[in-house]
Amino acid sequence: MKMRTGKKGFLSILLAFLLVITSIPFTLVDVEAHHNGTNGTMMQYFEWYLPNDGNHWNRLNSDASNLKSKGITAVWIPPAWKGASQNDVGYGAYDLYDLGEFNQKGTVRTKYGTRSQLQAAVTSLKNNGIQVYGDVVMNHKGGADATEMVRAVEVNPNNRNQEVTGEYTIEAWTRFDFPGRGNTHSSFKWRWYHFDGVDWDQSRRLNNRIYKFRGHGKAWDWEVDTENGNYDYLMYADIDMDHPEVVNELRNWGVWYTNTLGLDGFRIDAVKHIKYSFTRDWINHVRSATGKNMFAVAEFWKNDLGAIENYLQKTNWNHSVFDVPLHYNLYNASKSGGNYDMRNIFNGTVVQRHPSHAVTFVDNHDSQPEEALESFVEEWFKPLAYALTLTREQGYPSVFYGDYYGIPTHGVPAMRSKIDPILEARQKYAYGKQNDYLDHHNIIGWTREGNTAHPNSGLATIMSDGAGGSKWMFVGRNKAGQVWSDITGNRTGTVTINADGWGNFSVNGGSVSIWVNK
C-alpha cells in the first residue's frame, strides 16, 4: 500500500520523531568520554585474583600520578566494603557500611585495605584530576550472622516460575546484625522478610536447590530478565526490592557511600537480576539527594542487544551500560583464526545503536580466566580490541587492570607496553571527524581528522585479523605534506599525506597500526 505524505504529514512525522528522540534523557557518557575537552578513559582498577594483602588501596594511591600521565580520567574501584570473608572480592557483600573500619568476619581490613587507606587513595586520585566510580552491589547479601526459620518452596532452577515442591520450613542464612559495627552509620538490621530467596537450607544441606520464600508480599521481583523464566535470583540471600524498608535503606546507603568517599559515579552490579525500576529510581534519588549528576554504568551481562535495549527503556535511559555484545564480538574475533568478518565487528552492539549509552570494554573480572563468564579475548587480538575501543569517537572506553598489569596467578602477562601507545593515541590524537573504512573481510580502518583544540591531532587506525596489507584513507586536506608514523611501533617507515589529504596506510598480519603526525 502506497502512503501519500504532504507537507503537513511530513511535519507531523518529523515532530513525532523529534519527540521520541528528545524523550531520551541526556546521558553522562558523552560528558565522561570527552572529559573537559579531552578524551575520557576509565580504568577498572582490579581483577579477581589480586593478593589478599590489604595493600591494594596503597597501590592505587601511589599509582594515581602514573594513571593521570596515561590519560586515565576515571577509576572504577572494587567493592570497598566488608565481604563474607577477608579474601572476598566484595561481591559476597556482607556490610555495605564497613569500608574496612570494624572488626567483622575475622578482620578489620577488607581484601584491599582499611577505610583510611581507601580514603587516602581517593584523595590521591582527586588531586590528580581523576574521578572515582564506586562499585555497587545491591542484588544480594552474603555472610549472614545467623540463620532464621523461613517458610519456602523449591523452584525449578531452569524455570524459577515453576514451583516443584509444596511449602515447608527451611533454615536460611538471612540474619544480619553487624555485631562489630553496631548502629554506627546505620541502625538497620536485615531479617528474612527483607529477602526473596536463598539457595541453601542449613538444616538439610542439599546442593543445587533454589528456595523462594513464602509470606506476605513474597514473590520474585517481576521486572527482571526473563532468562530461566525469572532471573531475580542469582546468589546468596536475594534482596527483595519490593520491600519498602529495603528500598529506603539502600537509598540511604547510596547517599552515605557517595558523600563518605566523594564519589563521582557508580558501576552497578548484576542489574538484570534487580527490579529495573528500582535501579532507575535509586540512581535518581542519589543524584537528587547529593546534588551531584552522578555518572552511572550498569552491568547487564547478556549478549543480546534487544534485552539490553529493553532494560534501557525501562530505566528511562538515565544511565549507561557496558557493551557486552561488543565484548563477545571481540572474543569471537580473537578465537576465529583470521576467519572473522571484521566488517561486522560492531554489528549488534550497544555502541553501534546507542553510542551515548555505551561503555566499551575488552575484558573484565567476570570474563577473565576461571570465572563463571569466562570469555577472555586472546592475547594476540588484545591490541586490536583496545584500538577498537580507544581510538574511535563513539563510546566511553574502560581499560581492564588484568590486561594492563597482568594476572600473575594465571600466567596472563601484563600488556602495558602494548596498551600505552594506544592510550597515548587516545589522549593526544583521537579527535575530530571520524571516517570509517570497515570494508574488507580482514583489513579495516578509520581515521580521525583532528581539531584545533588539540594541535597536531588526527590519526589513522588500521588493523587486520588475517594477512597484512594497506588501505588508502582520508585524514583531511589540511594534513597534506605531513609525514606520519606508527605510534605502536608495529610498522617502521613513514606515510606522507598527499595533496588531497589521503594516505596509504599499512598494517602487519594479525596486528594493528595507529598512524599519527608525531
UniProtKB/Swiss-Prot annotation:
<feature type="binding site">
    <location>
        <position position="221"/>
    </location>
    <ligand>
        <name>Na(+)</name>
    </ligand>
</feature>
<feature type="binding site">
    <location>
        <position position="238"/>
    </location>
    <ligand>
        <name>Ca(2+) 1</name>
    </ligand>
</feature>
<feature type="active site" description="Proton donor">
    <location>
        <position position="299"/>
    </location>
</feature>
<keyword id="KW-0326">Glycosidase</keyword>
<dbReference type="GO" id="GO:0005983">
    <property type="term" value="P:starch catabolic process"/>
</dbReference>
<feature type="signal peptide">
    <location>
        <begin position="1"/>
        <end position="33"/>
    </location>
</feature>
<feature type="binding site">
    <location>
        <position position="221"/>
    </location>
    <ligand>
        <name>Ca(2+) 2</name>
    </ligand>
</feature>
<keyword id="KW-0964">Secreted</keyword>
<dbReference type="InterPro" id="IPR015237">
    <property type="entry name" value="Alpha-amylase_C_pro"/>
</dbReference>
<feature type="binding site">
    <location>
        <position position="238"/>
    </location>
    <ligand>
        <name>Na(+)</name>
    </ligand>
</feature>
<feature type="active site" description="Nucleophile">
    <location>
        <position position="269"/>
    </location>
</feature>
<feature type="binding site">
    <location>
        <position position="240"/>
    </location>
    <ligand>
        <name>Ca(2+) 2</name>
    </ligand>
</feature>
<feature type="binding site">
    <location>
        <position position="232"/>
    </location>
    <ligand>
        <name>Na(+)</name>
    </ligand>
</feature>
<dbReference type="InterPro" id="IPR013776">
    <property type="entry name" value="A-amylase_thermo"/>
</dbReference>
<dbReference type="InterPro" id="IPR017853">
    <property type="entry name" value="Glycoside_hydrolase_SF"/>
</dbReference>
<feature type="binding site">
    <location>
        <position position="196"/>
    </location>
    <ligand>
        <name>Na(+)</name>
    </ligand>
</feature>
<dbReference type="Pfam" id="PF09154">
    <property type="entry name" value="Alpha-amy_C_pro"/>
</dbReference>
<dbReference type="GO" id="GO:0004556">
    <property type="term" value="F:alpha-amylase activity"/>
</dbReference>
<feature type="binding site">
    <location>
        <position position="139"/>
    </location>
    <ligand>
        <name>Ca(2+) 1</name>
    </ligand>
</feature>
<protein>
    <recommendedName>
        <fullName>Glucan 1,4-alpha-maltohexaosidase</fullName>
        <ecNumber>3.2.1.98</ecNumber>
    </recommendedName>
</protein>
<feature type="binding site">
    <location>
        <position position="232"/>
    </location>
    <ligand>
        <name>Ca(2+) 1</name>
    </ligand>
</feature>
<dbReference type="InterPro" id="IPR006047">
    <property type="entry name" value="Glyco_hydro_13_cat_dom"/>
</dbReference>
<dbReference type="Pfam" id="PF00128">
    <property type="entry name" value="Alpha-amylase"/>
</dbReference>
<keyword id="KW-0732">Signal</keyword>
<dbReference type="GO" id="GO:0005509">
    <property type="term" value="F:calcium ion binding"/>
</dbReference>
<dbReference type="InterPro" id="IPR006046">
    <property type="entry name" value="Alpha_amylase"/>
</dbReference>
<dbReference type="GO" id="GO:0005576">
    <property type="term" value="C:extracellular region"/>
</dbReference>
<comment type="similarity">
    <text>Belongs to the glycosyl hydrolase 13 family.</text>
</comment>
<keyword id="KW-0479">Metal-binding</keyword>
<comment type="pathway">
    <text>Glycan degradation; starch degradation.</text>
</comment>
<feature type="binding site">
    <location>
        <position position="242"/>
    </location>
    <ligand>
        <name>Ca(2+) 2</name>
    </ligand>
</feature>
<keyword id="KW-0119">Carbohydrate metabolism</keyword>
<keyword id="KW-0378">Hydrolase</keyword>
<feature type="binding site">
    <location>
        <position position="273"/>
    </location>
    <ligand>
        <name>Ca(2+) 1</name>
    </ligand>
</feature>
<feature type="binding site">
    <location>
        <position position="219"/>
    </location>
    <ligand>
        <name>Ca(2+) 2</name>
    </ligand>
</feature>
<feature type="binding site">
    <location>
        <position position="196"/>
    </location>
    <ligand>
        <name>Ca(2+) 2</name>
    </ligand>
</feature>
<feature type="site" description="Transition state stabilizer">
    <location>
        <position position="366"/>
    </location>
</feature>
<dbReference type="InterPro" id="IPR013780">
    <property type="entry name" value="Glyco_hydro_b"/>
</dbReference>
<dbReference type="GO" id="GO:0033927">
    <property type="term" value="F:glucan 1,4-alpha-maltohexaosidase activity"/>
</dbReference>
